[in-house]
Structure formats: C-alpha cells, structure tokens
Amino acid sequence: MQPSVYYLTPDYDLPSWGIGLLYKHVEILRSHNVNAFVLHHNSGFSIDWLEADVPIAFLDDPSIEIRSDDMLVVPELLAREGITVGGNCRRTVFVQGSYFVLQPFNEAISYRDLGYETAIAVLPHVKDVLERHFDITATVVPPFIAPYFFCDERGSEGHSRQQRILMFPKLGYREAGIFDYEIIRKLLQRDCRQNPPWKLLEVSGRPHREVAALMQNSEFMVSVNCLEAFNTTVPEAMAAGCLPICYEGFGGQDFLVDDQNALVFPNNYVYSLADTAKEMMVAFEKNSSLLAEMRTNARLTASTYSEENTKRALVALFGDLGY
C-alpha cells in the first residue's frame, strides 16, 4: 500500500496564508501522485476563504490509521502535540516562523530528540536558526504568493489606484505588549484627515481574493509586524503594486531592500515610519517616478516567490524522503 503524508493543521478558520500553505503543499503533492491529506482535529471543520481542492482527514475519526511508513508534517506551533499523534510514524516539522519554535515548550528542545527526522523551513534565515539552535537538518521550501495578487505592468505603476493606505491588524501583538500598531494607526488617521483625499483602511477577516483586489487598488500598505518570517501581507502587497512601508520584521532580511522595493525601517522605529508615510502622502506627485520604479522592483521581488519554485523544492524533498 502506498504510504501517505498527513499535514497536521490547526482548526483555525480566519484567513491565514500560513494555514493556506499547508493546504497548498497537500495540493501540490497530490498533483505529483503523493497520497497526501490535510489532517484537522474535529470532524466537519473546514475553511471557506481559500481555494484548494484537497482531501481532509480528521483526528477524531476512528477509521483514520496512520501507519509507520506514513509521514506526519507538523507546523512548529503544534510540534509538542505532533509527537503524540500517529504512533510510530515518520515526522517532519514545518517551520514558518522561527520565533514560534519554543512557544509550545517550557524549555529549549532538540527536534531530533523529540522524534522529528527532518524539517521544512520557509526561508533561508529559518533554516539557519533551526540548524544552529534546534538540532535538525532543514530544507528550504519557499512560500509562494497566490497568483491573483499579481497586477499587470500598468497596475504595478500605480495607475487608477485610490489614494489609500492599508493596514492589517494581527492578533496577539497588542496582547504581547507591542503597541506600535495602535500608535501608527492613530497617527495615520490624523494625517489622512489633514491630507484629503487620502484614506486609511484597516483590513481583517476578508476573503483572500478581496484582499488582493484592495491591494491592487491602493497606493500603500503599512506593516509594523516585528516578529515575522515571510510576513505574507508584505510580499502580497509587493505583487499587487501596493508599496509597503514597513518594519523589516526580522524575516524581511531575506527579500526587503530599503528604497528599492519597499520603504523599510528597523523594528519599533514607529515614529520614523510615520514621518515617511506622511511624506509619501504630502509629496505623492513629486515622488511619482521614484514610486513607479520601486513598484516595479517590488513586483520583480514578489515574482521570485512563485508556486513553481515551491513545487520544485517540495517535490524534490519528498522524493528524497521516499514518497
């Protein structure tokens, strides 16, 4: 019997491209004749914001039998739970954010000692962290940006866009005592009122394609997320021609270049970021040529995160693992 691959996935129904990638990995593997499944916890759970045609198995289904030659792929946030699922099956940990590795644990861990035989890392800096600090060999399988975020060349130059700045609140930051979002939101609200027709729009809980359309019709996106890997909304905005004004966020070191493909600030330099955002509003016409060049560069950067590149790396990895 052909061995199977199960992607353990949280029962979380809000839009999250991190969860979307779990589904898309399964979709890619199945298109290459790997018997792969999304594995949710509770029967009947589903998400409605993502377009993905994949079979879903459920942990509470007594008919599910994970065999010793099957592979369980576990996101880093579920790594502690993952060692209790699937008996003596093979295990791979899928790390999308190095900051979250230790969240499920009370002390530093070795993934190998926990029973994980290998790791998938979304970006080079994540691979480096895993191999230096968590005792596991990692393979980079890069993320990709959903193709419907990419605008045509005319769109990337900012034509027919609203003078609008998008922000995406992220759960957990305020609770963690990181107040940058509230500071920049209040400052931008005032700056937009003082510089019509500029508007600020906070976006949350919307379908993925609707987010893409908003980005393709907006000039800027502000992100003050600071504990990130891919920080998906930033490269999505780059693809859509919606120029990011953002923190590096740690993970951005792998693809952000200040004044070339984004306006980039060190983490927590919230007032410097606010100064630049206001300047972009006030001197928008004056900066039009510079902004057009940066949008083009941003789109080129985003284009390197293609589904084809993800597919190539993922299929090669599972081929090496014997699937």
Q: Residue locations for each model-derived region?
A:
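N-terminal pre-catalytic "stem/leader" segment of glycosyltransferase-like enzymes
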Residues: 1-71, 250-252, 264-265, 304-308
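Conserved catalytic-core segment of nucleotide-activated headgroup transferases in glycan assembly
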Residues: 18-21, 128-136, 140-208
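Extended catalytic core of nucleotide-activated donor transferases of GT-like folds
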Residues: 37, 41-116
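Short alpha-helical segment that forms part of, or immediately flanks, the ligand-binding pocket
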Residues: 212, 235-239, 253-254
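Aromatic "clamp/platform" in nucleotide-sugar-dependent glycosyltransferases that forms part
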Residues: 226
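Short hydrophobic beta-strand element within catalytic cores of glycosyltransferases
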Residues: 243-246
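Conserved acidic donor-binding segment of nucleotide-sugar-dependent glycosyltransferases
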Residues: 258-259, 263-275, 281-288
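A charged, aromatic-enriched C-terminal amphipathic alpha-helix characteristic of glycosyltransferases
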Residues: 285-319
